[in-house]
Amino acid sequence: MARGALDWIGAELEALDAKGLRRSLEPIGPAQGPVVQVGGRALVNLCSNDYLGLAADPRVRAAAADAAMRFGAGSGAARLVAGDLPPHGALEARLAAWKGREAALLFGSGYHANAGVPGALVGRDDAVFSDVLNHASIVDGCLLSRAELVRYRHCDVEELAGLLARTRARRKLVVTDAIFSMDGDAAPLRELAELCDRHGAMLYVDEAHAAGVLGPNGAGLAEALGVQDRVDVHMGTLGKALGAFGAYVAGERRLIELLVSRARPFVFSTALPPPACAAALAALEVVATEPSRRTHLFALCARMQAGLARLGFDVARVASPIFPVVLGTEVRALAAAAALRERGWFVRAIRPPTVPHGTSRLRVALSAAHDAAQVDGFLAALAAVLPDLPPAEPRRAG
C-alpha cells in the first residue's frame, strides 16, 4: 500500500520523464561479453567497462568458484572485526607489487574508496583541489572531508598552479581521475606531480579506467608516464579491466596504516567477498602473462578513433577505450541509442547530471573481446542513423 508521505515522488518522476532524465534498469545476460542478450535480442555490447574481456574468462570464474568453496560466499564481517580472510591479504600484496608500492588496502567499491580516503587525509583546515570533470565519487569524498573544495578547469595545470600558490591551507590534496570516464582523455600526471612537489601537496590519482589497460605492465597511467613514485595515493578498481568487484588504494605503508583506522567506508563495511578477491588475483595473472590483450585492444581503439573522426566527432584527445560520441541534447542521445539498438548495437545514452547540459552523448567503450569487424559495423550503423536524429539545439549554460 502506498504511503501518503511519499506522494511527492510521483511529481518528481514526471519531471524526470519530461526532461528525458528518468533512468531505468535493464537486465542483460547471460554474462558480460562482446555480445549480450537484452530484451530477448542479441546485441553487440559497447557500453561495458570490461576492457580486457575478463569478467567471463573461464580462469577468472573458476578462481571465484574455488574461493567460494574454500572460504565461503561472503566475509561475514568487517576486516577489523572477524572478516579478514586469506584472500584479502593475498590480493593486497599482489596489488602493491603490481603498483610498485609498499602496501595496499581493499575497499568495497571505487565509490567507497573515493568517498572515504579524502576524509582520512584532510579536514576543516585543509584544501582539496579537484578537476572539474572528476568522477562524482571523488566530488562526494571531497565534500565529506569538510576540507575546502577548490575545483579547477579540466586538466588546466596553469590555473591549478595559481590556486596552489595562493592557498593558505594547512594540508593540500590534489585529486584527479587518470582517465576521465565520460571523455576518455588522460590527466597531465607529469605536470600535476611537478606542481605537487613544488607546493608540498599530496597527489591522489583515481586509475579506475586506466589500471589493467595502460602502462608496460598494465598498472595504469602513472606507470605509463613513469610517475608512480610521485603519486601519493594510487586508487584503482577491480570491477573494470580486472573483471571482478571492489577497489583498492596503494601507497606507502604508513598511508595504508592510517586508512585502516580512519577511512570510514573501510572501517564500517563488511569485507569484500573471498570469491571477488580470488577473481581479481586470477585476472592480475592474465594481465601479467597476456599483454597481447592490451595490444589488440589499442589496435581496436585506433580503428574506432579514426572512424569517429571521419564522422566529425572530436575524439583527438581520447587516450583509452572510452569514446564520447557527443550529440548535444538528451533527446538526440536517446534517439541515437534507440536507433542503434534496432540495428543490433547496445550503447547507452549518457545524460545530465552525469555529463554537463548540452553534451549528452553515447559513451562507446571497447573491450579486448571485440574484433575489427564489430568496430567497423558500429561505425557504419552510426553513420546511417545520424541523419535521422532530431535537430540539434543550442547548448545551455552550465
Curated annotation (Swiss-Prot):
It is an enzyme of class 2 (transferase). GO terms for biological process: biotin biosynthetic process. Pfam families: Aminotran_1_2. It catalyses: 6-carboxyhexanoyl-[ACP] + L-alanine + H(+) = (8S)-8-amino-7-oxononanoate + holo-[ACP] + CO2. Gene3D superfamilies: Aspartate Aminotransferase, domain 1, Type I PLP-dependent aspartate aminotransferase-like (Major domain). The modification N6-(pyridoxal phosphate)lysine is found at residue 240. It comes from Anaeromyxobacter sp. (strain K). Catalyzes the decarboxylative condensation of pimeloyl-[acyl-carrier protein] and L-alanine to produce 8-amino-7-oxononanoate (AON), [acyl-carrier protein], and carbon dioxide. PANTHER family: 8-AMINO-7-OXONONANOATE SYNTHASE, CLASS II AMINOTRANSFERASE/8-AMINO-7-OXONONANOATE SYNTHASE. Pyridoxal 5'-phosphate binds at residues 110-111, 181, 209, 237. Homodimer. InterPro entries: Aminotrans_II_pyridoxalP_BS (IPR001917), Aminotransferase_I/II_large (IPR004839), AON_synthase_class-II (IPR050087), AONS_Archaea/Proteobacteria (IPR004723), AONS_Proteobacteria (IPR022834), PyrdxlP-dep_Trfase (IPR015424), PyrdxlP-dep_Trfase_major (IPR015421), PyrdxlP-dep_Trfase_small (IPR015422). Its EC number is 2.3.1.47. GO terms for molecular function: 8-amino-7-oxononanoate synthase activity; pyridoxal phosphate binding. Belongs to the class-II pyridoxal-phosphate-dependent aminotransferase family. BioF subfamily. Keywords: Biotin biosynthesis, Pyridoxal phosphate, Transferase. This is 8-amino-7-oxononanoate synthase. Its cofactor is pyridoxal 5'-phosphate. Transmembrane segments: none annotated. Substrate binds at residues 23, 135, 354. The keyword Transferase applies. NCBIfam families: bioF. Pathway: Cofactor biosynthesis; biotin biosynthesis.
